[in-house]
A protein has these predicted regions:
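Structural beta-sheet core signal
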Residues: 54, 80-82, 150
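Canonical P-loop GTPase G-domain recognition
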Residues: 88-147
Length: 319
């Protein structure tokens, strides 16, 4: 099912114009029913694999991870695939790589669409299993293929990544979240076999920010939310994290005290998005902002850093 509720999220984008629907705060929930079955399938198939590769969006490494994965995978060797690294801030990606490695998780930065970095997948997977492979050799199991499970939430580019690795259209890729279904083993060169699983997402977001960040990148369909309110939250975050991107792309110079709605209106005026009576066309501006951010036209931007995760752990007393 798909829902958007206004019960718990206190919007920080500022006071919206007095227009129907725009004063609704956002608490995004996204959990199609087939994902319960998928989670069970992942748990049941873990015994058949040697290593788990988790594909995440390098722009939102916190929001694009499924917190259930840690419990599901347990002590299995892990590899995190920082996909769409071409759209993420390189310095931020280095911070994330260091963070995951400090947790004992191997890392691969890549862009599945162009194929950049994908060739390193097999070496990274084997590196994560170095000790296990040595034990296989001791037992005379030379040439035994590495068997891996590839997991990830919907719309992080998992199917595109698998297609690129396998050099063929094995898994059905689509732009809409939740398009990949079923189960299949995919044989990759160099003795690597992948078990493809549909992406999974938890039934309820633990933090409203998670839902927003997923929506910013398109992991949640725009049709289930108010796009103008969403764009206001994005433009406010960009003003805080990457103000120069707004200046370069929209000629906006964020000033202290400006709300998301102020910024969105300023951008609309700079682009000449006006309707009858000189009123700004906020809907058009909202869609343009989201489209250009998702397409990488605003430069390489990472919305989340390891320090955000550590701050969250401190807030919950789990550091």
């Amino acid at each position: 099912y798909y829902t958007v509720s206004s019960e718990s999220y206190k919007a920080e984008a500022g006071a919206p114009p007095a227009r129907k629907g725009e004063d609704q705060p956002m608490n995004i929930q996204w959990y199609p029913g087939h994902m319960t079955k998928t989670r069970r399938m992942i748990g049941e198939n873990l015994k058949y694999v040697d290593v788990v590769a988790e594909v995440i969006d390098a722009r939102i490494p916190i929001a694009s991870r499924n917190p259930d994965i840690d419990d599901l995978v347990g002590s299995k060797p892990r590899v995190v695939i920082l996909n769409r690294a071409d759209q993420a801030d390189p310095a931020a990606s280095k911070q994330w790589a260091a963070y995951f490695r400090s947790k004992g998780i191997s890392v691969l930065e890549c862009d599945a669409r162009s194929g950049a970095g994908v060739k390193q997948f097999s070496p990274v997977m084997r590196g994560a299993l170095k000790e296990q492979i040595a034990r296989w050799k001791e037992k005379g199991q030379v040439g035994r293929p590495v068997r891996a499970m590839v997991v990830g939430i919907p719309n992080v580019g998992k199917s595109t990544f698998i297609n690129k690795v396998a050099k063929k259209k094995s898994a059905k890729a689509g732009d809409r979240p939740g398009v990949t279904r079923g189960k299949q083993w995919i044989t990759v060169d160099q003795g690597l076999e992948l078990l493809d699983t549909p992406g999974i997402l938890w039934p309820k977001f633990e933090d409203e920010t998670i839902g927003l960040h997923l929506a910013f990148t398109g992991a949640v369909r725009d049709a289930i939310m108010d796009v103008e309110t969403l764009a206001c939250h994005l433009i406010l975050l960009l003003a805080q994290r990457k103000p120069e991107a707004l200046t370069a792309r929209f000629k906006i110079v964020p000033e202290e005290g400006m709300s998301g709605w102020d910024l969105l209106e300023a951008g609309a005026r700079k682009r000449g998005f006006l309707i009858s009576g000189g009123e700004v066309d906020l809907e058009r501006m909202a869609n343009i902002l989201l489209d250009e951010f998702r397409a990488g036209k605003m430069g390489r931007i990472t919305l989340e850093l390891p320090e955000d995760l550590e701050r969250e752990e401190d807030d919950h007393g789990t550091a």
